[in-house]
Amino acid sequence: PRQPACRRPGGGGLPPEAPVEIELKLRVAPGDLDRLRGAEMLTRIAAGPGTTRSLTSFYYDTPDCALQRRGVTLRVRRIGQRFVQSLKTERRGDGLARGEWEVALPAMVPAPDAFDDPDARALLDGVPVEALTHLFTSRIQRETRILSLPDAVVECAFDTGTIETRDASDPVAEIELELKEGRAAALYRLALSFLDEIPLRVSEVTKAERGYRLVARRPPGVMY
């Protein structure tokens, strides 16, 4: 079947009052991920043993990728027995911050009108729910720990799994560092301390972008 006309997004704005997610993503080898999980330095700063969850996320767009061209991503995620719809914008110039809105849903079905925030609704304006199609899926096993640093609190997520289209898949092994309190510089310092334990590299490519590249049949290893 004919593939949607998706492409790498460019530009994209962040409404001035948008809720902001500040996050640093690190790409690692699966074996190195296990090494870091057991590292003494991580145990010292972890607030507890952490939690593990299975996350299944459906990503939606129109057949001509109207949302991607607007620089936004619409996702519905299953977390246990809950369903959460998220709308995210592209990252700002520093590569860390982007707008993010979330709302609970009754099922794994997109509902753009469920967002109450006017900025979120404006980003989806003119895209009726009947025009949306399920483009790709991520299936992730996530271990999350809260890390207490001298000047920040960081949520550290170890993600393994796959991003899948109907006829292709891309493996995932990455760490997401999300700032909960403090300054964004703490994320980079934490990443440098991880680098003393394992090889890693910073990535600005989101799971959504990787999914769009699969849909567009780009080689998974290009531009990561």
Model-derived features with residue positions:
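Phosphate-end processing signature that detects enzymes handling 5′-triphosphorylated RNA
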Residues: 6, 13-224
